């Protein structure tokens, strides 16, 4: 039964119309110092919801959300949670409209042995913005 359900889910993804690239922009630099205490990946359709999340994860010291025209755009915040050094980074690989969803594909870069890093807690994250598409957003972590 599980195999049947899994097979149907895979077939649904394979049989859909081809993926359509979604243009996006990275606004991470407009929110310096954000510290996300656990992995996250979610879409925000309003400034107030994004601000509420920032306040929830950084009480008393949350940065203000960047200027985003939420009448036209939506934002997606992805974060890997705390990491032990400066060598970690997140990269948005691509954003695609696929069937009835928008897929945001993310890859975490980890430092290799011998790479110069500083041992301190870091919080890799990306905040991206794209034109509002009235479909659910799925964050897909590649390589995990």
What are these regions (language model features)?
Residues 3-144:
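Exposed, flexible binding/inhibitory loops of compact, secreted disulfide-stabilized domains
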């Amino acid at each position: 039964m599980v195999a049947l359900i899994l097979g149907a889910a895979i077939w649904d993804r394979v049989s859909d119309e081809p993926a359509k690239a979604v243009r996006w922009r990275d606004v991470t630099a407009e929110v310096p110092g954000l510290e996300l205490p656990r992995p996250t990946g979610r879409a925000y359709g309003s400034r107030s919801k994004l601000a509420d999340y920032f306040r929830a994860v950084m009480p008393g010291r949350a940065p203000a959300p960047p200027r985003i025209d939420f009448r036209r755009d939506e934002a997606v915040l992805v974060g890997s949670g705390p990491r032990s050094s400066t060598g970690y980074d997140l990269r948005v690989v691509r954003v695609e409209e696929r069937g009835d969803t928008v897929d945001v594909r993310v890859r975490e870069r980890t430092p290799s042995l011998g790479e110069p890093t500083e041992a301190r807690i870091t919080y890799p994250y990306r905040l991206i913005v794209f034109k509002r598409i009235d479909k659910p957003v799925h964050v897909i972590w590649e390589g995990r």
